[in-house]
């Protein structure tokens, strides 16, 4: 893993976008994208740039089960408001939270990924080491599937909802096996509350107990941190 440490998340987000631009200059056509507060500075850098994304395809990691695309807490809504409405892409794929059947939706999404191999995958990391909604215990060979959210993830996401009771209990998530097929991976982490997970991901053993540790098995991963998220690393 190539670890890059920045003073703040704004600088880190700009650097992540620089890597995406380099990839696009070298022919990248498919971006794997993430939601949540972590990639927002990267999306701001993308929106404020003069880069044209109209020939690019995006594939998002996950979506809450049960939320409509126009629900302001859905990940489709997040992507539209933070990026797609401001920088149009050729195609944008996000799991359908209102799909009638989980098996049908996960099969559809796995085909989307197979038909559009991801050149650059952007990830965040949860406090418990999850990537996407691949919680501790997730198999490393999994594809897209419907997953239950752990209580710690529900607690972490409750701040975005009116109450904890409103937080969805399930999500569709790209699996770790699918993530590892990406040609290049950028993992962003900011804040002291991510420091333990970052240390385990980089310096700990490869274990299903820390889903992000699977990235040690990938040949091209750039970990982009602010100083707080890097604060517990032995080597800086």
UniProtKB/Swiss-Prot annotation:
InterPro entries reported in the protein's UniProt record: Glc/Gal-6P_isomerase (IPR006148), Glucosamine6P_isomerase (IPR004547), Glucosamine6P_isomerase_CS (IPR018321), NagB/RpiA_transferase-like (IPR037171)
Gene3D superfamilies in UniProt: 3.40.50.1360
Pathway(s) per entry: Amino-sugar metabolism; N-acetylneuraminate degradation; D-fructose 6-phosphate from N-acetylneuraminate: step 5/5
Superkingdom: Bacteria
Active site: 62, 128, 130, 135
Enzyme Commission (EC) number: 3.5.99.6
Region forming the signal peptide: none
Its job: Catalyzes the reversible isomerization-deamination of glucosamine 6-phosphate (GlcN6P) to form fructose 6-phosphate (Fru6P) and ammonium ion.
Protein name: Glucosamine-6-phosphate deaminase
Organism: Lacticaseibacillus paracasei (strain ATCC 334 / BCRC 17002 / CCUG 31169 / CIP 107868 / KCTC 3260 / NRRL B-441) (Lactobacillus paracasei)
Originating gene: nagB
